[in-house]
UniProtKB/Swiss-Prot annotation:
Xref: PROSITE patterns: ADOHCYASE_1, ADOHCYASE_2
A Pfam entry, by short name: AdoHcyase
Top-level EC class as recorded in UniProt: hydrolase
Record-level Gene Ontology MF annotations: adenosylhomocysteinase activity
Protein name, per record: Adenosylhomocysteinase
Bound cofactor: record note: Binds 1 NAD(+) per subunit.
Native source organism of the sequence: Bordetella petrii (strain ATCC BAA-461 / DSM 12804 / CCUG 43448)
Gene this protein is translated from: ahcY
Amino acid sequence: MNAVSDQAVADYHVADMSLAAWGRRELAIAETEMPGLMAIREEFAASQPLKGARIAGSLHMTIQTGVLIETLVALGAEVRWASCNIFSTQDHAAAAIAATGTPVFAVKGETLEEYWQYTHRIFEWPEGRHANMILDDGGDATLLLHLGARAEQDASVLAKPGSEEERVLFAAIKATLARDPKWYSTRLAQIRGVTEETTTGVHRLYQMAQKGELAFAAINVNDSVTKSKFDNLYGCRESLVDGIKRATDVMVAGKIAVVAGYGDVGKGCAQALAALRAQVWVTEIDPICALQAAMEGYKVVTMEEAAPHADIFVTATGNYHVITREHMQAMKDQAIVCNIGHFDNEIDVAALDDCQWEEIKPQVDHVVFPDGKRIILLAKGRLVNLGCATGHPSFVMSSSFANQTIAQIELYTRNEAYTRGQVYVLPKHLDEKVARLHLKKLGAKLTSLRQDQADYINVPVEGPYKPDHYRY
């Protein structure tokens, strides 16, 4: 059955339900590589800590996310899911989860209009019920309810879209308010909290909290050590070059590769490219990160210096217009340009509208400038590792998603301990718990601390072992 043609009766929207069996086989493989999630299922399945939780999920609909969804359901939650990126869905994963009865709204290559339609659908629960928790990646689900509720009171907030994505979002909100003037505030009032996956979404949350605009409590999953120092670093170290090579078949060795941004994501990208014997150059605004890059042997330059010389460009900053039209105009013919930050505006793709676009294959485009020079743009400036490959490996996502699951349990079952409008991180003992759950899979054995040793360094025998301010 093709779900796209069956929407009148089906509470889901995926590309092709005939892919479900394939997706299920890959889910089975992923489970063997996700020990954290499987251990959490075993620990909490009987107690059902998420019973009564209705989770609106906005996160890349991949095989690994399928294991997360089924973990949440195994712990008692009801879930509705959409992808947080128009290119990141794995259609067989979406079909496999939809086949279990969990509503999924995600298609690889969906339009922006469909993207925001699907994000609305995760808040449209049957029988007059509403979501009471959000699991977010990038903050779009959180943004949607807050912006829509503001628009109910002041329509002028939708008057001046600053991008094509905002134009589509604002139009979707206006259409929804025309049908139900209280659609957003009704749903916003029911949310007990959000757990946020990624750096960009966390920045949004802190901005909202600082302005007094955040309507519920939030847990910043990204800054758990077992997320940011593993997913962001080790995940990108493997998935970046996977995406670039699947898209272009380029030989990386000997090329000059520029990594814009040397945070955890940038560090992983630089390591990956250097391991393939690229000459790695780094651009940075932060003197500490710049010094780290220089001490690793990377050349620290400006984008203006790098543009005419490099062969591969990767943005990993979380900022916007890091690579501009002027930079791309200065690049060599056939330079490869891609982004591994959450949003598509790190590269100023909108400034290329007057260029000729030639699709080489899905998510790989030649952009031809008026002088005939071409660059190769990957995933139209969106996440290259998910647009051109399948994202991070299952094992490292087990660590991230174990944090997400624990954060959902924490925020749902102990909601009174978290103040509305504030952003929290998981306590250190839970961070260490996530790490413990993954050691056996790698054959790692911890040394046990004796009581006299614990007394000597003034820590509990069972941890936590580091103060909150410790930098891993």
